[in-house]
Amino acid sequence: VTWRSAPGTTRLTLETPVRAVFSTDFSSVKYRGYVFAPELALERSGLGLPRSRARIGLGPVFASGGLMDYWYRVEERYSRPGRPAYDAASGYLGLRLQFSYRVPLTERISVSAGGRLENFSGASNAGSPLFRSELNATLVGGLSFALYRSPAQTGSAAEPFD
């Protein structure tokens, strides 16, 4: 679901992604479960620098029982003093705030920066001995480069966010 401002410089979106989660030890791949992370996001183009795009989003995160087991379950055979057996449950994982800022430097090169703040207070598995912290912060930076651009291009009436 998306709302756009009249001049097309701002949009508000509600995203409802469901993602499958897999792990690998490079000899096999295993399905671990899924994550449902709805997010309400505000995006703005041309904020600060021409052609830039700023985005901030907020939403809860929920995970399946299989995925929660992968992260938080402690089987009886691995329990020890200070780390009792624990059977994880599906449900609320936490609240996520994400933000990013992207600036195209040329037609082929863009620079971006962003981050994520996560609050796991009230998570369904906060009682697990493997649950370490209620807060998590991540910062990222990146440089993207288009290796090839087709000389055949079509006209487009797309908005800056498309």
List the model feature ranges, each with a label.
Residues 1-4, 84-89, 139:
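Short N-terminal helix-initiation segments at or just after the protein's N-terminus
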Residues 13, 35-37, 138:
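Broad gene-expression machinery/nucleic-acid interaction feature
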Residues 13-19, 55-61, 114-116, 142, ...:
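Transmembrane beta-strands of outer-membrane beta-barrel proteins
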Residues 25-112, 116-125, 130, 161:
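Outer-membrane beta-barrel transmembrane domain signature
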Residues 1-28, 133:
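Internal, conserved structured core segments that host functional sites
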Residues 6-14, 47-50, 108-111, 148-154:
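Repeated loop/turn-to-beta-strand initiation elements of outer-membrane beta-barrel proteins
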Residues 134-162:
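Outer-membrane beta-barrel "beta-signal"
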Residues 2-4, 19-21, 41-45, 98-102, ...:
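Transmembrane beta-barrel domains of outer membrane proteins
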